[in-house]
Swiss-Prot record:
Belongs to the UPF0235 family. Gene3D superfamilies: YggU-like. SUPFAM superfamilies: YggU-like. InterPro entries: DUF167, YggU-like_sf. It comes from Salmonella arizonae (strain ATCC BAA-731 / CDC346-86 / RSK2980). GO terms for cellular component: cytoplasm. This is UPF0235 protein YggU. The gene is yggU.
Length: 96
């Protein structure tokens, strides 16, 4: 499975998360995953909720349309974006 996969109702992303970064950004490929840096610490689900909020802004969807399918407690996650309104250039480059 690749880092970004299209499905019938959106995108499935395989992510590697770097918590406590200096800024929120999509870094690029990290092996066969997309590396995402977020400022939140990995404590009490703060990083997960911050990741959902960040991805919602990047894809211009509501937080309820961003679902963490796998990896709630780890750095390696599988996230589904339902009906993205916009695809960030870093992700668009990987889907071609």
């Amino acid at each position: 499975m690749s880092a970004v996969t299209r499905c019938e109702d959106g995108l499935v992303l395989r992510l590697y998360i770097q918590p406590k970064a200096s800024r929120d950004c999509i870094v690029g490929l990290h092996g066969d995953e997309v590396k995402v840096a977020i400022t939140a610490p990995p404590v009490d689900g703060q990083a997960n909720s911050h990741l959902v909020k960040f991805l919602g802004k990047q894809f211009r969807v509501a937080k309820s349309q961003v679902a963490i399918e796998k990896g709630e407690l780890g750095r390696h996650k599988q996230v589904k974006i339902i009906h993205p309104q916009q695809i960030p250039p870093e992700i668009a480059a990987l889907t071609e």
